[in-house]
């Protein structure tokens, strides 16, 4: 929707709230969805190859494991809701994913030599992700940052696939 602006800059109008929500969803939210899930697939694939199928128990900080178990329990205790996924990685936040990659960067480096730059880039979208995830309007610079990280991550995934790195869905 070209010309849609943050509804909070105007006199209240429910139609503006709807338009702003549609704009953020169509322009930004889906890219964050893709970023987080591509990172999950890459982390799972690389750590499975480097550590083994039990990589979560071996390579993830116990604090993150405990947080994920609490989140998983929230869903288990409310079985009438859908769940994020079967693997624990789907219960990890973007900040958790970054910490997992940081702690295991030596295992990522053979496959993604510039992993430190990727960690920094994920950190650049963490706060804008929270803004969008909590249904607020991102700043133009944040939208551009998300656009660039999304496009570059798509390229990285294509490069990994072309290099023979097996990418598998957790």
Residue map of PLM features:
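Amphipathic alpha-helical interface elements
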Residues: 1-170
């Amino acid at each position: 929707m070209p010309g849609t602006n943050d509804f909070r800059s105007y006199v209240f109008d429910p139609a503006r709230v709807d338009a702003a929500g549609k704009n953020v969803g169509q322009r930004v939210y889906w890219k964050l969805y893709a970023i987080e899930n591509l990172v999950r697939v890459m982390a799972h694939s690389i750590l499975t190859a480097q550590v083994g199928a039990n990589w979560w128990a071996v390579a993830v900080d116990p604090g993150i494991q405990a947080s994920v178990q609490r989140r998983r329990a929230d869903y288990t205790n409310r079985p009438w809701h859908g769940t994020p996924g079967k693997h624990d990685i789907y219960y990890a936040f973007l900040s958790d994913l970054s910490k997992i990659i940081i702690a295991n960067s030596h295992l990522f480096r053979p496959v993604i030599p510039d992993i430190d730059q990727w960690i920094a880039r994920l950190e650049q979208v963490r706060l804008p992700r929270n803004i969008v995830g909590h249904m607020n309007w991102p700043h133009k610079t944040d939208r551009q940052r998300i656009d660039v990280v999304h496009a570059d991550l798509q390229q990285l995934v294509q490069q990994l696939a072309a290099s023979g790195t097996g990418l598998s869905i957790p």
